Regions:
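Interfacial loop-to-transmembrane junctions
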Residues: 80-106
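Juxtamembrane loop-transmembrane helix junctions in multi-pass integral membrane proteins
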Residues: 32, 36-42, 58, 62-65, ...
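Mid-chain, well-packed structural core segment of small domains
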Residues: 50-53, 57-86
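Juxtamembrane boundary at the C-terminal end of a transmembrane helix
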Residues: 110-118
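Cytosolic, membrane-interface loops and tails of multi-pass inner-membrane proteins
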Residues: 12-38
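Physicochemical signature of membrane-embedded alpha-helices that form the seven-helix bundle of GPCRs
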Residues: 2, 37-40, 70-73, 97-100, ...
Length: 118
């Protein structure tokens, strides 16, 4: 539920900018719209798969402390990445946000893959 609540304002921000600029499709060369689209798009491209991997990891017996740690990494990573992407094109905080997203993606995915082998 929390990640759905995080996605909602990003969706609204894209729609609002589209209304302001009267750009119905793509980014029309508007840098602000492009940043908003990419912040939203990157969220949609990563969060569902990590949450699915998290659910499978839980189902396969990953201890709750690891689930919480991975979930908090994902939350922090998505907040940091979205905040920085909306304000700047590139930077260390944005990259760190992706690292915090990749850690649970690899951890939950790796655990689930391992448990499928044994």
């Amino acid at each position: 539920g929390l990640f759905a609540l995080l996605q909602f304002p990003m969706t609204i921000m894209v729609g609002y900018r589209r209304a302001q600029t009267e750009i119905p499709f793509l980014d029309g060369g508007d840098a602000t719209l492009l940043r908003r689209m990419r912040a939203h798009g990157n969220f949609v491209e990563t969060v569902p798969m990590v949450l699915l991997a998290m659910a499978f990891a839980e189902w396969n017996g990953l201890p709750p402390s690891w689930l919480w740690a991975g979930g908090l990494c994902l939350l922090a990573g998505r907040l940091l990445h979205a905040w920085w992407t909306l304000e700047h094109a590139w930077g260390v905080p944005r990259a760190f946000g992706m690292v915090l997203t990749f850690l649970p993606m690899l951890g939950f995915g790796g655990w689930t893959f391992y448990k499928g082998l044994v």
